[in-house]
Amino acid sequence: MENIQSGTLPAETAEQTEAASVAEVVEANDAPARRASLVDFLNSPAALLVAGAILIGAVFWYLQFSTGSLCCGDYDAYYHFRWSRMLWEGMRTGHFPPTFDALPLTTLNPKDYVDHHFLFHVLQIPFTFFSDFQTGAKIGTWLFACLAVFSCYWLLVRQRVSYPLVWLVAIVGSSAPFLYRMNMGKAMSLSIVLLVAGIHLFFERKYRWLLPLAFVFALAYDMFALLVAAAGLWTFVILWSERRLEWRPLVYVIAGSILGFVINPYFPHNFQLLYEHLVIKLTPNDFTTTVGSEWYPYTTWEFLGNCGVALAAMFVGYVSFNDSASEGRQRAFLLLLFSTLLMLANMRWRRF
């Protein structure tokens, strides 16, 4: 009582006050560090990949399940999924590959039939185990579409591109036909994953792995030619920037592609089918039997409307590109050349 009346504090109270003051100072000093730590975590590759996966999964889930049928009014997806089930049944019964007898009066008769999406159909088999085939097909299509876009996003994060989530939004929102085709239940989405894997191997210069990758690509989809083209462009980039011929990427990719055609249940008929595809689809106007609309060009205004965002990005890339000898510029040069090739292909054939 005497201490209170005299205006002094007990020793314990003074010590507590001093300790509290020290704690406040320490907390104030630690706050910026905690904020910096949180920012570092949010910008870490793991956090960026998780955020991107959630965004991609949500967008494609909404698109795929916004309709009761397989998106998007395309009948090919039903064929692909049903054939995957027939492959599984053939494996179980020892009749592999099974006989395809749905179109006996065409080049797809049982004798000449070739499954040029063979590995893609094998990868679809687990989704045929659903009691409701349509649900299984939609989930499988959703997963492959997600993997396609996520692989592109992963490459952005891997290469430490600034603001990868912004670029992801640009990828998802740049073209309605792109979203349309990713939701069609075809092998295109798988081909994007394999292409990104190939580009990553170019960048890391792990060329030997290109052989098994090309082998898998040739078994999965006949657009393996895109990987061959990318390998050729990378060889050119190295020749241009380093003044030396780096032959390994192109040789490994070509060798793997040939092996994928030879070590194939449909060999040698798959070579004949490849030739027929090249002839009829590269010159569709010379045949009375037309091919699918995806092999015809857009009109000019359709092309500009569908690819406006991508074309704007291409223009900015052309203007800002700096041709130097650095490794980063080599990578940028490859992507610039390859995207230009795809743009020109899309001008001629809308499927690209």
Task: Give the residues covered by each predicted segment.
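Membrane-interface alpha helices of multi-pass inner-membrane proteins
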Residues: 178, 196-201, 208-223, 227-228, ...
